[in-house]
A protein has these predicted regions:
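Extracellular glycan-interaction surfaces
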Residues: 2-11, 24-93, 320, 326-354
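Acidic glycine-/aspartate-rich tracts in secreted/extracellular proteins
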Residues: 6-12, 39, 63-68, 80-82, ...
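Extended recognition patches within non-cytosolic domains
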Residues: 67-69, 74, 83-89, 121-184, ...
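Short hydrophobic/aromatic patches on beta-strands that form ligand-binding or substrate-lining surfaces
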Residues: 1-9, 58-60, 107, 122-126, ...
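Trp/Tyr-centric glycan-recognition "aromatic platform" motifs on solvent-exposed beta-strand/loop surfaces
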Residues: 19-48, 285-316
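Secretory/extracellular carbohydrate-interaction modules
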Residues: 5-14, 233-296
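Extracellular glycan-recognition modules
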Residues: 1-34, 66-69, 131, 136, ...
C-alpha cells in the first residue's frame, strides 16, 4: 500500500485502509502509526505524527513468504523505513491477509469497528497485489530535499487499484470518487462523501487550513478538513489562525459567514497569548488586523497586544466603518505583505472603493506586521467556512488565481491562493 495523508486532528484513530478480521493500517489515537493483523499489532511506532500542516507518505510493503521475519512487513514514512517501534511483532511465515480476498475492504474506514474514520485528507492511494515495493516506486526527493510523489509505472496485479480521487460521483464506477484508474476497474463505493469532499489540497500542492493546535478558550470545533469553524459563546475573543505564516507576497482568500463572527482577518502568531500561559492576560491577547464587530457596528480595526487594547488603524482615502455583514455573505480578503496593506470586501465589492491591484484605499497593517501574519477567525458563537482556494462550500462561479484555487469572486491581479505552489513562487 502507498498513500498520502494529511491529519486534521490529534487524539483520534485515522484509518487509512482496513478489511475484515481486524486488519488495518491507521494513525492511532496516541499519534503513532499502527499496522494491525493476525490479531495483534504488527507495528506500533515510537514516532509520533502530530503535524496538521504536513502530508505524510505511507508505504506498507508485505511479503509473508519471506523466511527472514524482519523482511515480511516493512513500514516507510516519507521515503524512510521506520525501525523504532513500541511494538514490533512480525506475522507468521505465509500469513494470509484478507486484503486480497473477496471480503469487504475499506479506504478511510475500519470495516470491523465504527467510528474510526479519518479526519484529514487522503491522496494518491495505490494497492499493489503480488509485489513488495519500496517507496522509490511512488516518490522521490526533489532538489530541495523534500519527498514528493512521482508517477507509478509498474503493474497492479489482479486485485490492485489506484485511487486518484479526481471524480465526484457517488457510485462505484469510473465517474465516482472511489474510481480505480489502474485499469482493473476495482471501483469502491463512496459512503457519506459528496463532490465538495474532492479538493485541490493534495500532496502535490498543499493548501492552508485552520491550525487545530492553536490554544483557545471556550468551545471551538473545526471540521471539513479544518476549513469550517464553529465557536461557542464561551469562546470570547478566542479563535484559530492558519497553518501558513505569511511574511511577503500578495494573497487572497474568502470567508463565508454562516452565523455572525466576532473578528476575522489577520493576526501575528508570534504575539498570540492566552491566560493559560500568561496570567497577566485577561483572556486572549495578540496583534490583529481586520473586521471587528462591536456594539452592532462593524469596523476595520487593529489590536495592540499591550493590555489587549484596541486602536483604529488608518484607511487611506476612506472610512474604517464598513457595512454590516450578514449570514451567508462571502467576505473577500486581499493581503499585500510587501507594502503592509489589507483590503476587505463583501460579495464581490471591496469596501471604500479599494483596488488591491492598483494599491489604492488600503487598510494599513500593524507596524510590526513584518514578523509574519496569518489569516484568523474569532468566534463568540459564530460559524464560518474559510476558503484559501480549497473550498468546503459550494462555489457558484469558480475563479482561480490564474492557475490554482477555486473562489467565488475574481482574484485581484497579482494576488494568489494560499498554497505551497504559490508560496514557492511569490512567498
Amino acid at each position: 500500500m502507498s498513500c498520502w495523508f494529511k491529519k486534521c486532528e490529534d487524539g483520534l484513530n485515522h484509518t487509512l485502509f482496513s478489511t475484515t478480521g481486524t486488519q488495518d493500517i491507521r494513525f492511532a489515537s496516541n499519534e503513532r502509526l499502527l499496522v494491525y493483523g493476525e490479531s495483534k499489532s504488527i507495528f506500533n511506532t515510537n514516532r509520533l505524527f502530530r503535524d496538521p500542516s504536513a502530508w505524510y507518505h505511507i508505504v506498507v510493503a508485505c511479503d509473508t513468504t519471506q523466511s527472514t521475519a524482519s523482511n515480511r512487513v516493512k513500514l516507510y514514512v516519507n521515503g524512510t523505513q521506520e525501525t523504532d517501534f513500541e511494538t514490533n511483532s512480525q506475522p507468521s511465515q505465509n500469513y494470509d491477509w484478507n486484503f486480497n480476498h473477496t471480503v469487504e475492504q475499506g479506504i478511510g474506514e475500519r470495516v470491523t469497528t465504527a467510528g474510526l474514520n479519518p479526519h484529514g485528507y487522503l491522496a494518491d492511494f495505490h494497492w499493489i497485489d503480488g509485489q513488495q515495493l519500496d517507496p522509490t516506486y511512488f516518490g522521490e526527493t526533489n532538489d530541495n530535499g523534500v519527498w514528493i510523489p512521482k508517477k507509478y509505472t509498474g503493474t497492479y496485479g489482479t486485485n490492485g487499484f489506484f485511487m486518484e480521487f479526481q471524480q465526484t460521483g457517488t457510485s462505484a464506477n469510473s465517474s465516482g470518487i472511489g474510481a480505480d484508474t489502474s485499469g482493473n476497474d476495482n471501483h469502491f463505493t463512496p459512503t457519506n462523501l459528496a463532490a465538495l469532499d474532492v479538493t485541490e489540497d493534495t500532496c502535490t500542492n498543499n493548501f492552508a487550513t485552520l491550525l487545530p493546535t492553536v490554544r483557545h478558550t471556550g468551545t471551538i470545533t473545526l471540521s471539513e478538513g479544518n476549513t469550517k469553524i464553529v465557536t461557542g459563546t464561551d469562546s470570547q475573543n478566542s479563535g484559530k489562525y492558519s497553518t501558513f505564516v505569511l511574511t511577503s507576497g500578495k494573497w487572497y482568500w474568502e470567508v463565508k459567514q454562516d452565523v455572525n463572527l466576532n473578528t476575522m482577518g489577520l493576526i501575528i502568531p508570534s504575539t498570540y497569548k492566552d491566560n493559560t500561559t500568561d496570567p497577566s492576560v485577561g483572556g486572549m491577547s495578540h496583534y490583529y488586523a481586520g473586521i471587528y464587530r462591536q456594539y452592532n457596528n462593524t469596523v476595520m480595526k487593529s489590536r495592540n497586544q499591550s493590555g489587549g487594547s484596541n486602536y483604529n488603524s488608518t484607511v487611506t482615502g476612506g472610512s474604517n466603518s464598513i457595512p454590516e455583514i450578514s449570514a451567508n455573505d462571502i467576505i473577500m480578503f486581499a493581503l499585500d505583505m510587501d507594502n503592509g496593506y489589507l483590503y476587505v470586501g463583501t460579495n464581490g465589492t471591496f469596501h471604500n472603493s479599494a483596488d488591491p491591484a492598483n494599491g489604492t484605499n488600503a487598510f494599513n497593517l500593524p507596524t510590526n506586521y513584518t514578523e509574519g501574519m496569518s489569516p484568523h477567525i474569532e468566534g463568540d458563537g459564530g460559524t464560518a467556512h474559510i476558503n484559501f482556494g480549497n473550498p468546503a462550500f459550494s462555489i457558484s462561479s469558480g475563479n482561480s488565481d490564474g492557475k490554482y484555487g477555486n473562489f467565488e469572486y475574481a482574484v485581484p491581479s497579482g494576488y494568489y491562493a494560499l498554497c505551497t505552489k504559490r508560496l514557492a513562487e511569490f512567498g
